[in-house]
């Protein structure tokens, strides 16, 4: 090894060690000036000898060249969100659900930690070196932010020690400490630049900079809170012990994290953090409680979007008084008329709030609110602003009643309210400009047709200029036409056309979701596609056939039937197909028609030890069974595993056949 290479190795090792002491252990052993001198020497040597550059060099923290866009990263293990509890009763219900499922939870410890208000990220270490970082995104797919994350000094580019797995995914929160946020905004104010609203927005904006040099200048921090992929090694079977392992490898862990042994201690931890919240160095909006035993976590499993073994116990929403100046009525994609309160701006829950939803006419009546009232505004869960009450003693003499419109405020069509529904709707359909805009925004959204470059502002201009009326009109646009729009040059216009052409190759679930059928989300669209296999079959299905689809009840089935019964909707579909929208054909898995389960409606409940729930479902469907998520009088068989709960009780009450896991295995042979 040459003298230069040896010196580079020494410098990197020394800077790594001092970085851990400073950012992880909070116990620096050299002055900042000495650290800076070593870093300058490293930068100079690497600049003079680029052939000796290393992917884990501390110098990478200063940032690289700007990116054109972020690449997508598919998470090998989904990054799910957490369910919330807002009071002790909901926390106790969470605990009871777990103990009803698995009694051993009663004897488990719980790992408790503050719920940081930042941005969730995934860090992938291969042979101890940070090779990729990604945002959480939608939980399934995030964005590659490796270059930006390398600039965060608290995140090690190389793990310490030698006992870590060969592939280790560390998950945690990138956030901006309060002091760093205040200093950042002070600099922005001095320069006459726009200030950030809160530390979370500042952290998110900093992390998603295409130029990592900008990120490097931002005071970002990181705390690890879990792991994802583990290959080529093993971790402790305790969540808390895994934290200690991560800390030993150089990853920072929230110092407030605590292991407790009872629900009472969980509540005490929550109250302690709540009382000290304002004195912490970072913003939090609650605490996270996790079952500590990893094996119990695995047995408890997950629901669709969250683990059963963890919950976020949110702090009480912060409330403030403000004036209700006016009420505007907005029209949504499905024609829903929503009253929006226009408020005297007030700072609450970390943001300035000037609007709040009043939901519907029933809510206005319940509150007894009038324009001119002083109202109590709350950010429910510290997220959604809402009016919770009226201060009647402050009502002025000139307060005005809120009159719900009988005609659409946009197109003047009649406003209708279906009996039994709280929502009033414009009857104008796509002749209503507001519905048209929202329908088109939905159509091009990421989970739908995923057309890049067609943002809300562009859609609004296209509708206002009467350039598009239906989704099919989008595919008739030409680049030359788009250049008349604001901020749309020839290159941007061509990019939009290219994106539209690319979007023509889609999937049946995405196409169904893009149509904007009431209460048909992306998961329901996927179930419909997998059940019927073709658009034609869906268009011709009856109410009874729709109800056979997993998670489709009478209400959703009625919406589907009504949608496909309308000639104008069929015309929109035909026009889209004429524009060249296609998708790969779907084929059904082979079904054993002579199976004893063929045509039977089956429900799985409880946890199974010999196969996963998904494997059992797939095997049953291959035998011709229809697997649904709830027990009803139409259910033929229930297979009950360990800790089966309410579904088993209902099946017994209805006299439905119930079999255990061993019987399920026999059926599948």
From Swiss-Prot:
The protein's UniProt keywords, in alphabetical order, are: DNA damage, DNA repair, DNA replication, Ligase, Magnesium, Manganese, Metal-binding, NAD, Zinc
Domain BRCT stretches: 592-669
| GO process terms (BP) | DNA repair; DNA replication
Query: Species name for this entry?
Result: Vibrio cholerae serotype O1 (strain ATCC 39541 / Classical Ogawa 395 / O395)
Q: What does this protein do?
A: DNA ligase that catalyzes the formation of phosphodiester linkages between 5'-phosphoryl and 3'-hydroxyl groups in double-stranded DNA using NAD as a coenzyme and as the energy source for the reaction. It is essential for DNA replication and repair of damaged DNA.
Query: Which positions are tagged coiled coil?
Result: none
Q: Which SMART domains match?
A: BRCT, HhH1, LIGANc
Annotated protein name in UniProt:
DNA ligase
Keyword Zinc recorded: yes
The protein's Enzyme Commission number: 6.5.1.2
The record's family statement is: Belongs to the NAD-dependent DNA ligase family. LigA subfamily.
Report the active site residues.
115
Its encoding gene is what? ligA
The residues listed in the UniProt record as binding NAD(+), with positions renumbered to this chain, are: 32-36, 81-82, 113, 136, 173, 290, 314
Quote the catalytic activity from the record: NAD(+) + (deoxyribonucleotide)n-3'-hydroxyl + 5'-phospho-(deoxyribonucleotide)m = (deoxyribonucleotide)n+m + AMP + beta-nicotinamide D-nucleotide
Needs which cofactor?
Mg(2+); Mn(2+)
GO function term, MF aspect, one: metal ion binding
